[in-house]
Amino acid sequence: MESRKIKVMATAIALIMVAMVVDAAGADKGKDKEECTAQLVGMATCLPYVQGKAKSPTPDCCSGLKQVINSDMKCLCMIIQERNDPDLGLQVNVSLALALPSVCHATADITKCPALLHLDPNSPDAQVFYQLAKGLNETVSASAPTGSASEPTSMSSTPGSSAGNNSGRTTSVPGTNHAQSFSKQWLGLEVVAHFFVIFYIFILV
């Protein structure tokens, strides 16, 4: 009984993650959904941790994270890019999310995300990744034991030209046109509909 409830809730979380990927993909919705759905379902159990609701990630979360990093890092980049989209109603603690690879003993370089997402290195979207990585490195360095050499971190940073004062802080970039905004609003309605379906199944179970 309890196992079935957990599976239902994990499926609901996975639906949100998949929706995030589909929205970020734009014209390549079908292709990106096909590539990322399985990996994101595997990471569904990470959501309680990166939202600050769990003290540590589950073994399944770490396994799913490593699979995404090894098979398609682009999917992880999309999750980071869309982490604060208000239309999706999904809030992620950036510090916990970026520290997740280290906690799971995995290696992930988010400074590669702009290239994987085909972003201009000097664009605001790209600068978000560079500054988040820089902020993580500074946090790790500050927490290193005194008198001992700090271990190399899995995140590296590239200096940006337009976001030098936003290190480690959450940054959101507004949409470029009305069509993109309408698309996100429609996607939000779809996610809500999915939740009602999952909630109904959850009650029946």
Curated annotation (Swiss-Prot):
Q: What induces it?
A: By abscisic acid (ABA).
Q: Where in the cell is it found?
A: Cell membrane
Lipidation positions, renumbered (GPI-anchor amidated asparagine): N177
Q: Could you tell me which cysteines form disulfide bridges? A: C36-C77, C46-C61, C62-C104, C75-C113
Q: What is one Gene Ontology biological process annotated in the Swiss-Prot or TrEMBL record?
A: lipid transport
Its record classes its membrane topology as:
Lipid-anchor; GPI-anchor
Extract the Pfam families matched here.
LTP_2 (PF14368)
- CDD domains named among the record's database cross-references: AAI_LTSS
Propeptide feature ranges? 178-205
InterPro entries per the record?
Answer: Bifun_inhib/LTP/seed_sf, Bifunc_inhib/LTP/seed_store, LTSS, Plant_nsLTP
Under Gene3D superfamilies, the record lists:
Plant lipid-transfer and hydrophobic proteins
List the residue ranges of the region (Disordered): 141-176
Q: What is the lineage of its organism?
A: Eukaryota, Viridiplantae, Streptophyta, Embryophyta, Tracheophyta
Q: Which residues are glycosylated?
A: N93, N137, N165
Principal place of residence: membrane
Q: Which GO terms describe its molecular function?
A: lipid binding
Which protein family is it in? Belongs to the plant LTP family.
Q: In which tissues is it expressed?
A: Expressed preferentially in expanding leaves and sepals, restricted to the distal side. Expressed at low levels in roots and stems.
Signal peptide (UniProt feature, chain positions): 1-24
Name the keywords, alphabetized.
Answer: Cell membrane, Disulfide bond, Glycoprotein, GPI-anchor, Lipoprotein, Membrane, Signal
What species is given as this protein's source?
A: Arabidopsis thaliana (Mouse-ear cress)
In its UniProt entry, what is this protein called?
A: Non-specific lipid transfer protein GPI-anchored 13
